[in-house]
Amino acid sequence: MSKLTTGSFSIEDLESVQITINNIVGAAKEAAEEKAKELGPMGPTAMAGLASYRSWNLLLLDRYEPVLTPMCDQCCYCTYGPCDLSGNKRGACGIDMAGQTGREFFLRVITGTACHAAHGRHLLDHVIEVFGEDLPLNLGESNVLTPNVTICTGLSPKTLGECRAPMEYVEEQLTQLLATIHAGQESAEIDYDSKALFSGSLDHVGMEVSDIAQVSAYDFPKADPEAPLIEIGMGSIDKSKPLIVAIGHNVAGVTYIMDYMEENNLTDKMEIAGLCCTAFDMTRYKEADRRAPYAKIVGSLAKELKVIRSGMPDVIVVDEQCVRGDVLSESMKLKIPVIASNEKIMMGLPDRTDADVDSIVEEIKSGAIPGCVMLDYDKLGELIPKIAEVMAPIRDAEGITAIPTDEEFKVYIDKCVKCGECMLACPEELDIPEALEYAAKGSYEYLEALHDVCIGCRRCEQVCKKEIPILNVLEKAAQKSISEEKGWVRSGRGQASDAEIRAEGLNLVMGTTPGIIAIIGCPNYPAGTKDVYNIAEEFLKRNYLVVVSGCSAMDIGMYKDDDGKTLYERYPGTFSGGGLLNTGSCVSNAHITGAAEKVAGIFAQRTLAGNLAEVADYTLNRVGACGLAWGAYSQKAASIGTGCNIYGIPAVLGPHSSKYRRALIAKTYEEDKWKVFDARDGSEMNIPPAPEFLLTTAETWQEALPMMAKACIRPSDNNMGRSIKLTHWMELSKKYLGVEPEDWWKFVRNEADLPLAKREELLKRLEAEQGWEIDWKRKKIISGPKIKFDVSAQPTNLKRLCKEA
């Protein structure tokens, strides 16, 4: 008897009876395993489970020891508690502070992973329903389409339908991971860290499925370095037109709105703009042929409340992720209808999915309902523009805005009693009382300066005893700068092409391109948006390859040089040294890890399928890269960063990120931790302490710069590469911290490693300060370095990769 597989069949001899079998239990997995056999070489961890990467994870965690920063001394997780875990005490269940802190961090990571995976599931199911499961994956000039999927599952999907198996794999593993959170399950902090790293790898699978599905189905730019430039900023909005604002991360519903606008010639009659990652993806829609874009980006998550308070939107449509919990309540104050288009965020609104569009418009126009849930995307596409057309003249006639008049502004300023409660409540510790004091004397520039630094959380307003609407006051003071707030950002180009990887791979591995700097994440910056611009510009000037995504990519586009050009206009969008490559929205972060993985797979010919440890070992030892999530706030940021860490890619976070409760920092003075194998013969070899962390925080962007440059040093750097990297690290430290690093000499293997412009000076210092023997006639180092340079050395942490093994 032939085996049953997925699909359907009918028994024709039975009258009026049809039996349809949608799925055979186990058939999908069997089919996936059969498919995997077609892929060729396979590593040892295809379809990895909770324990599959444990040996690799523990190897990482042995060098990069977890540094725990608990938020409090109690555990309130079950009804035995709350339990005091201070002073090495254990809770009633037996867990200690380390275990509880590990569990808390792990919970954040799997929450972020689940968020991206659920996004991917919703999007994948929808595009399969609309475009069919046989739609080919088209990501541009690439054969390695899904490096993260292939590494974790062994699969290499070529169609939308084939993406189901990796999606099901992620969902199954997430269920297993979530189970370990339950009381009476895992209690060892080190194993929570291992599971967190595994969850991070799953996150990049979920993100990858999400983005490849939408790039293929929605005709996004496909590995396109010339993806269109998009207007960004509140000053880019034409206030004479009705304004639709989309907020969230899942663009599926918004594409229907854009289709309706195009079919009904509305693109020049109304504005459509976005906040957060939906904004990026709506500007990528149908842009593969580089048509003139009309969708705009208002800004990042930090702009949500500011945009609502401005009164500019005539209707807001929300989907999922990074949507403020007060969007509806704040919008209701200003008669801005809110339409929820995704089951994950319904805001208590009435469901009108089955109602007639015109009847919904009438309900909203009359004020009978403040908005509704609309899950039928065909109706959503028609509903949103119709609401905007109806509400715009009504709201314009009433002049609705939360921004105070000149008279109200003065009254609010004079009400301040300088109690300082607002400053204490502010996550950024902004000196609001001082700014109000200056404003009372007629100097408004201090208030205006707070506009950019303010993250728009309104915590200050809730503690103000005088009930001053502080956010509105800040926005009033900054009206001129807001009206001029206009920049350019390159639309998300998707992944790096195989050809780009081949061309740039050698430079990255040898170190002649100093490194990949990935600037990603949320806008919870410690001192305003210009920090990420400053960091990006500094590294671009030094020929680093800068990759950006999400809110950080938006904020980088808000600043211009003296010639009025943004970084996106000044630097090419190519995957090469000195390139500024915007991959797109949050889910496109998978293409950043994917690029490092493709260097291993394409340039170094490493097997990707089911082979995470070997690929990660390669990136840790050979691919200079460092991530920056300077404003990280969400659980998704934790999972994205942890997914980078399992691949040996370090990440620097902003000062708020100590609240994630865990860092991974090595002890550079423990020399035994800095030994690896030489794959040529299995012998031990010393390596420099680089990277010296996998996850850490910095207090200022000036501190972050040299940290990131140092984190791009790799054991495999050739002399020219090491010299270039040392030059940048030492110069950045001197420029921004006022001192050269104390440990620069640890990275010198011979005189050719030294920065060329300072070689003689540094040789003198090595002789005087470190006691190294120098042949001054030949200007060569005779003795001193503990690390010997061998151009053919093959550093690896995996004994099984050594030839003797």
Swiss-Prot record:
What's a Pfam family this protein contains? Fer4_9
For this chain's record, the cofactor binding note is: Binds 7 [4Fe-4S] clusters per heterotetramer. Binds 2 [Ni-4Fe-4S] clusters per heterotetramer.
Q: EC number(s) of the enzyme?
A: 1.2.7.4
* Primary enzyme class: oxidoreductase
Q: State where [4Fe-4S] cluster 2 binds.
A: 75, 78, 83, 93
- Sites binding [4Fe-4S] cluster 4 sit at 426, 454, 457, 460
Domain 4Fe-4S ferredoxin-type positions: 407-435, 445-474
Binding site residues for [4Fe-4S] cluster 1: 72, 76
A GO molecular-function descriptor: anaerobic carbon-monoxide dehydrogenase activity
- Quote the subunit structure annotation: Heterotetramer of two alpha and two epsilon subunits. The ACDS complex is made up of alpha, epsilon, beta, gamma and delta subunits with a probable stoichiometry of (alpha(2)epsilon(2))(4)-beta(8)-(gamma(1)delta(1))(8).
Family note: Belongs to the Ni-containing carbon monoxide dehydrogenase family.
What is the documented function of this protein? Part of the ACDS complex that catalyzes the reversible cleavage of acetyl-CoA, allowing growth on acetate as sole source of carbon and energy. The alpha-epsilon subcomponent functions as a carbon monoxide dehydrogenase.
Q: What is this protein called?
A: Acetyl-CoA decarbonylase/synthase complex subunit alpha 3
